[in-house]
Regions:
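A solvent-exposed, charged loop/short amphipathic helix patch at secondary-structure junctions
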Residues: 22-45
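Structural motif
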Residues: 85-86
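N-terminal glycine-rich "phosphate-gripper" loop used for MgATP/nucleotide binding
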Residues: 89-93
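Short, acidic/small-residue loops that bind anionic groups at enzyme active sites
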Residues: 102-124
C-alpha cells in the first residue's frame, strides 16, 4: 500500500479571455475585437474572474499535508496520473469527459464555477463545497459511469466518456466496412460513425437521434451499453444505407475496417489526441473495461 499523501490535481482549461489575449495581445485589442462582433469585454472578463475565483477557492480547500498540482486541459495527454490522485475538474461538464479517458479508477470531483451557464451534469459541486468533499472523500458515494473503447488491430486503444468518432480527419466522406456482432456487414461511404455512452446520450448522439425516427433507445449513464450512428450514409452500387444505427449491449462490439487513407478515431471532441488508421486497418468499438468514478 502506498504511504504517499493523496495528490489533488486541479484540471481547468483556458478561459475565453485567456484565448483572446493569446490571440490579440492586449485587453484593448481584445475589447475592440469583441465590439466588432456586438459583444462586451466586461461579460468575458466577469466569466474569467469567476473561474479564477473558483480555482483559488479549490486550491485553498486542499489539506495542508496533501500534495497538489494544476493541469491545463491542453496538457492532459502528456500528464501521468498516479493511483493516489484525486482529480478536481473546475469548469464545464465537458472538462470531466476530457479528463476521464486518461484515468484508471481515480475519483473525480466536478466543480462548477458558473452555474448560470453550465448545466452541472458532471460538475455538480460549488467551489466552496470542495473542502468538505475532500475531508469526507473515503465515505462519499461514487457513481460509476460507462465509457466507450476504440481498439485498433495494432494494440492502440482510445477511451471516451461521451462518445468516439470514427471517420475522415476532415469530416469528408470516409469509406469503410462496418460489421456487427451478429454477423451483419455493410460497406459505407459516410461522414463518419459516432458511438456514444449513456453520459453522451444528451450530447452529440442526442443531436443525431433527434433526426432519426428509428433511433435506438439511449442507455443509462451507468448501463453497460452504447448506441451508434452512421452519419449521412451515401447509397451507391458499392455502398449501402441499411446498417446506420443500433445498440451495443454488454460484450457486443462494432468493427470498422478502413478502406482509405486519412481515417481517424478521437474521443469527446479532443481531435488532436487521436488514433490514425491506414488502409485495411480495423478498429473495434465496445464498452470499455474502465469506468469514470464520479464523486457525488
Amino acid at each position: 500500500m502506498s504511504t504517499l499523501a493523496p495528490r489533488v490535481v486541479l484540471v481547468s482549461r483556458r478561459s475565453e479571455l485567456d484565448e483572446l489575449l493569446a490571440r490579440h495581445g492586449t485587453m484593448a485589442a481584445a475589447a475592440y475585437f469583441l465590439r466588432q462582433r456586438g459583444r462586451d469585454l466586461d461579460e468575458v472578463a466577469a466569466r474569467h474572474a469567476a473561474q479564477q475565483a473558483a480555482l483559488t477557492t479549490a486550491g485553498a480547500a486542499v489539506p495542508a499535508d496533501w500534495r497538489r498540482g494544476h493541469l491545463d486541459r491542453a496538457d492532459l495527454s502528456r500528464f501521468l496520473f498516479a493511483p493516489e490522485d484525486v482529480v478536481v475538474a473546475v469548469g464545464q461538464d465537458g472538462l470531466v469527459a476530457n479528463v476521464a479517458k486518461y484515468l484508471d479508477g481515480q475519483p473525480v470531483i466536478g466543480v462548477n464555477p458558473a452555474p448560470d451557464r453550465n448545466p452541472g451534469v458532471l460538475v455538480r459541486h460549488p467551489p466552496d463545497r470542495l473542502r468538505r468533499l475532500l475531508r469526507d472523500l473515503p465515505g462519499l458515494p461514487v457513481q460509476e459511469r460507462t465509457m466507450v473503447s476504440a481498439a485498433l488491430d495494432d494494440g492502440q486503444e482510445l477511451l471516451g466518456l461521451n462518445e468516439i468518432y470514427f471517420g475522415h480527419v476532415t469530416h469528408q466522406s470516409a469509406r469503410y466496412t462496418l460489421s456487427t456482432s451478429d454477423g451483419s456487414r455493410e460497406r459505407h461511404s459516410s461522414s463518419g460513425v459516432v458511438v456514444g455512452t449513456g453520459t453522451g446520450a444528451t450530447g452529440w448522439c442526442s443531436s443525431i437521434a433527434r433526426q432519426r425516427a428509428d433511433a435506438p433507445s439511449p442507455p443509462a449513464p451507468g448501463e453497460a451499453a452504447l448506441t451508434w450512428f452512421v452519419r449521412e450514409a451515401w447509397p451507391s452500387p458499392a455502398t449501402g444505407v441499411t446498417l446506420t444505427s443500433g445498440r451495443l449491449d454488454g460484450a457486443q462490439t462494432l468493427e470498422l475496417a478502413s478502406e482509405g487513407e486519412g481515417l481517424v478515431v478521437f474521443a469527446d471532441g479532443l481531435e488532436p489526441d487521436r488514433l490514425e488508421l491506414s488502409w485495411g486497418q480495423r478498429v473495434t468499438v465496445g464498452v470499455a473495461a474502465r469506468k469514470l468514478r464520479l464523486v457525488m
